[in-house]
Amino acid sequence: MGQMVEFEKNGVKVRGYIATPKWGGPGVIVIHEWWGLESPLSNIKEICDRFAQEGFVAFAPDFYEGKYADNPDDAGKLMTDMFENRMDKVDAIFKASVDFLKECRYTSPKKVGVTGFCCGGTLSMYFAGKFPDLIDASVPFYGLPQITKIDAENIKVPIFFILAEKDEFVNNDEVIDIAKKVWKNGVDVKVKVYSGVTHAFLNEKREDVYDPCRAQDAWNLTVAFFKEYLT
């Protein structure tokens, strides 16, 4: 359903995966895990295809710019390098991706949500605080707030935090504290902690952690949230 594309916007070269619905719809930026967009352990392209089936124009930017990992050690190095050394480029890729989606002829209305998983969940929180005027809703999945500053006081868009009870990477209490700060802004905030599951429970390519029942429920809630705020 989708395809890889490359474009240049505002002097920034971007590559990524786009999936479009038959009749058009609002946009969703889908942010990859620490594996990278092209990793065999990533299901981000499949998630974009599923969003398209639900009536969204989904675009997954490649924030690693062609690099990817197939083991935790290399994935950790890529993620750490991105957050420590490349955030200016990450910001530029994100802004270019938002412009790309809003200019896409399939995107109608011209609203854009953002979701992501693992380090992509972190970026979904980060972008909601850094660029609240560029997006209309955010759904971070098990993001790691400890690896970059999340400007919770500046989050002004509806946001839905999805967490795993037994997540060994994420301090759920820290994410809930962020949610409380956002709530004080008068923003619609939701938090869902899925019991009995761990990090990456939505990734069907990770048989060691995938939970089909809770993954489907989280997916349904995500689609409903975006339909509420993007359509």
UniProtKB/Swiss-Prot annotation:
It comes from the Bacteria. InterPro entries: AB_hydrolase_fold, Dienelactn_hydro, Dienelactone_hydrolase-like. This is Protein usf. One of its GO terms (molecular function) is hydrolase activity. Gene3D superfamilies: alpha/beta hydrolase. The gene is usf. Coiled coil: none annotated. It comes from Aquifex pyrophilus. PANTHER family: ALPHA_BETA-HYDROLASES SUPERFAMILY PROTEIN, CARBOXYMETHYLENEBUTENOLIDASE-RELATED. Disulfide bonds: none annotated.
